[in-house]
């Protein structure tokens, strides 16, 4: 557990024997987070094992560069600056800075993890050297020139205005990883098409990497895609049966006048969680492997909303992930995987009554007791009743 303030990173040392717990300074740092006192705590991934040596490194954005503190085997950290500037946005009376998305992948097949950023039409790769530091100059890899690093609503025109929603065709990178199990990084892209505020379609495209003369290359056309007649969102990846190929989980919902009116009257909106898998040619199927309906709730009076729990974990230790999802405010269901290729999931679900958090988005899935089955830890938040705020719910698979 680490804590960042204006000038330092602190590490939490738990109590042990006669020693009390304490916060100790781990490193003096500089970053663009310059506030003297924060109004609230925020979770950030500024501690990473960047060079995959098993040691905690520090990564913090500054206004004009990215600051790294790389750990060595003796406990020291070595600083390095990379020319990765924060993104600046200027309005009439304010200026804001956002850090760039950083991806960690081996981009030249040398067994070392490299740092990757995206700009329109290309990847910028900071290769890791033999001394575990990174090159100060980026190697550029061309990708489809319509692929962006930013969402369409973050892109401003020459006059400073946002994009016209009556005519949007926009691709943005959502993930860089090896999806088809060939040890070569691939690119997942969200493709948004819009002819109006209520007339949007969102698909996901996948550009598989290939080696040509020893160098990483991406084609102009997507290798495969996940599509639906409804709007897709919440792209996540999982290896359902541990075969090295990633399945895709997306949420699907319909946006229209009738759906909006119905949601306002009922205080909830139905959405489907769809799981797509690859075939033997690394193509995603047109139909999902499985579809599960869940419900999202909201309150116009309080301004709060409730997100459903929907995750895939192996709860019975058979090395195949099962589906776990919430059903209302006090029920959790589990659909077990089956060995049947035509019907990969059971038709009925297991049920358990528990007081579900309104927003279980930060649910932790880990094998807590080492029995080979994945357990579930749920946290309550501000949308839940006051008596639940100090509780943590631990569900052990059995």
Where are these regions (language model features)?
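Beta-propeller-forming repeat regions
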Residues: 1-398
């Amino acid at each position: 557990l680490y804590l960042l303030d204006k000038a330092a990173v602190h590490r939490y040392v738990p109590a042990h024997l006669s020693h009390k717990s304490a916060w100790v300074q781990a490193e003096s740092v500089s970053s663009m987070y310059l506030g003297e006192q924060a109004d609230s705590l925020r979770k950030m991934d500024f501690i990473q094992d960047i060079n995959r040596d098993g040691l905690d490194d520090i990564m913090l954005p500054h206004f004009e560069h990215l600051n790294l503190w790389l750990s060595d085997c003796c406990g020291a950290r070595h600083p390095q600056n990379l020319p990765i500037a924060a993104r600046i946005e200027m309005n009439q009376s304010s200026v804001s800075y956002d850090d760039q998305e950083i991806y960690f992948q081996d981009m030249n097949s040398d067994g070392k993890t490299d740092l990757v950023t995206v700009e329109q039409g290309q990847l910028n790769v900071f290769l890791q050297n033999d001394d575990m530091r990174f090159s100060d100059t980026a190697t550029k890899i061309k990708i489809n020139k319509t692929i962006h690093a930013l969402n369409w609503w973050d892109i401003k025109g020459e006059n400073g205005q946002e994009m016209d929603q009556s005519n949007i065709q926009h691709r943005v990178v959502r993930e860089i990883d090896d999806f088809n199990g060939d040890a070569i990084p691939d690119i997942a892209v969200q493709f948004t098409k819009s002819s109006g505020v209520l007339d949007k379609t969102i698909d996901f495209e996948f550009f598989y990497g290939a080696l040509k003369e020893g160098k990483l290359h991406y084609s102009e056309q997507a290798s495969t895609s996940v599509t639906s007649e409804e709007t897709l969102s919440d792209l996540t990846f999982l290896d359902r049966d541990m075969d090295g190929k990633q399945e895709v989980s997306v949420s699907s919902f319909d946006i229209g006048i009738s759906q909006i009116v119905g949601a306002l009257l009922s205080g909830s909106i139905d959405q489907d969680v769809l799981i797509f898998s690859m075939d033997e040619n690394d193509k995603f199927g047109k139909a999902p492997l499985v579809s599960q309906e869940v419900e999202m709730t909201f309150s116009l009076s309080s301004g709060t909303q409730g997100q459903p729990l929907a995750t895939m974990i192996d709860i019975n230790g058979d090395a195949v992930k099962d589906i776990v999802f919430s059903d209302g405010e006090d029920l959790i269901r589990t659909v077990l995987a089956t060995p049947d290729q035509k019907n990969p999931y059971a038709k009925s679900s297991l049920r358990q009554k528990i007081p579900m958090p309104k927003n279980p988005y930060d649910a932790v899935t880990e094998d807590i007791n080492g029995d080979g089955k994945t357990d579930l830890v749920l946290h309550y938040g501000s949308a839940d009743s006051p008596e639940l705020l100090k509780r943590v719910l631990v569900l052990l698979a059995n």
